[in-house]
Amino acid sequence: MELKKTVCYEDFGAVGDGVANDCNAIRAAHEYANENGLDVVCQGAKTYYIGPMTKAIPILTNVNWGDATFIIDDSGIAPLATADGITLRSVQVFNIPSPGGISKIEGLDEWKEKVNAEGGLNRDTFKKIDVDFGEPVLLRLYNDGHKNYIRYGVNAGTGGIQQETIVVDKDGNLDPNTPLMYDYEKVTRIDAYKINVEPLTIEGGTFITYPFLTNEPQHYTSYARGLACHRSNVTFKI
């Protein structure tokens, strides 16, 4: 196939009539785009039907779904349905992985010990981490000794460990768009990850879900059939 500047689903056999299952064509298009560093662009107001699947479609390049519509049909996926040992209701349609995997940064124990010796972190005064990273970094802070609770409503529970994610620049300065939400009496753990340098843009598209109608117990009825993002520096435009 002659190398093109963009890829569309019809190049790989998609019908786009809202009836034919276009899952395999969509997967093939993205795999080709990923391999060749090409954007995926939908042409016109096509409707793509997506049925059950056992693995997500990977996205590594820019996508413009434009006026296209995607029908994600869960109506035939029972809560406990499996294929090849995989629970079908838990398979995302699209997945945006981090190129080369997630790069974790080590060596922050000294800073953590210093912070704890000084009484922790105050959300009103914390502006900088005294570490020279050399590049922007995503930090995840934990206080395993403190729990935050949702006490009322359908999401009420037994609490979760206090944690949040912030971004600092190459010199350790806190990004004003990611201020601390909580005070930390103690930082028990800190994970640091390199931020993906190359930006990625996902835009356009209308998504419709046909749900599976069931009277099964509530804990069986959570479906994860959408788009999962596991990298940073991604812009979503509706």
How would you describe each model-predicted region?
Residues 1-238:
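Extracellular/periplasmic carbohydrate-active domains that bind, remodel
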